[in-house]
Amino acid sequence: DHAVYHREVRDVLEAMGLNVTVANSPEVLFTKPDVDFVFSLLNRGGYLNSEMMMPLLCTWRKLPYLGATPILRGLSDDKHLMKMAARARGVPTAPSAIYRRGAPVEQFTDFDADRFVIKPNASSASEGVGIAHNWTEVREQIAERHADGHDALVEPFLSGIDVELPVSGARKVQMLPLMRFDHDTEVLRTYAEKRGFEQTKARLVQETDPEFIAKIEGYTRLLAPEVSPFDYSRWEYRFNPVTKEVNFLEVNLQCNLWSQRVIGKAALIAGVSYPELLETILAGAMAREGVIELEHDN
């Protein structure tokens, strides 16, 4: 999918009349290229904390770029730190325990559950996520995450469905329609499912309950200042349809921009075409970086 996605973005940018130079490695920034702005889609480089590589290189080379500053990218991708920020801002999130590589692995005592979720603390699309039922299994999975080069985050399994809110924030926080994945509330969604490697029963639909939408938007407005300014993002929550409980899961500051993913489909529902979406995000990013000036702040 990513090859199709990246090609679609390139075609849209070129159709705007932009002179696009294509590269597939951060090494292009080892020597300063002759460009005015970097539109990076290399958000995962296959190693820990790779999401900070492109903004760091652009900062080093004094090149304006899409996304958010390196420190904000690092904060947003550290699930534990974002959950700490959520708690500080009064946004509900599940209890959790962080196990950094090289630190002692001692059993947590401040929460318990029938099932635990163990995940890499800085991964995407549920990569490396597993289920455990007791401390012995939890400890084994922590060791596996560490062996793979990740810090490990442990949480109770949360029954419910995923709800996702696409947000742009270069000049001010602007929210697209809230989307949800209807799926079995007791099943853990997998990396293979989210990446399209296996069939999924999860169905992406628009959320239409105005009170629920207002609640999710309110939580997001509370937490967004912790990672602002950012050009675009996707905020993820878990909603239990039975208990009505909502918990913040994570935020992706430079989420998948493909037209067939959440942000593209939400924009279409809002009456914004895919080219208009990319142009809006790009204009906001360029204004944030001082490349252009916009007449109207909307």
Regions found by a protein language model. Give the residues of each.
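Phosphate-binding site of ATP-dependent enzymes
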Residues: 133-218, 241, 245-247
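Anion (oxyanion) recognition and catalysis
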Residues: 14, 59, 87, 146, ...
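Glycine-rich phosphate/pyrophosphate-binding beta-alpha loops
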Residues: 125-126, 184, 252-266
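Conserved metal-phosphate-binding beta-hairpin within the catalytic cores
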Residues: 167, 224-257, 267, 296-297
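Active-site "cap" helix and flanking loop/linker of ATP-utilizing ligase/carboxylase catalytic domains
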Residues: 180-233, 265-298
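ATP-binding N-terminal substructure of ATP-dependent carboxylate-amine bond-forming enzymes
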Residues: 1-65, 71, 76-77, 81, ...
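Active-site nucleotide/adenylate-binding loops and adjacent lid/helix of ATP-dependent enzymes
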Residues: 20, 30-31, 73-160, 214-217
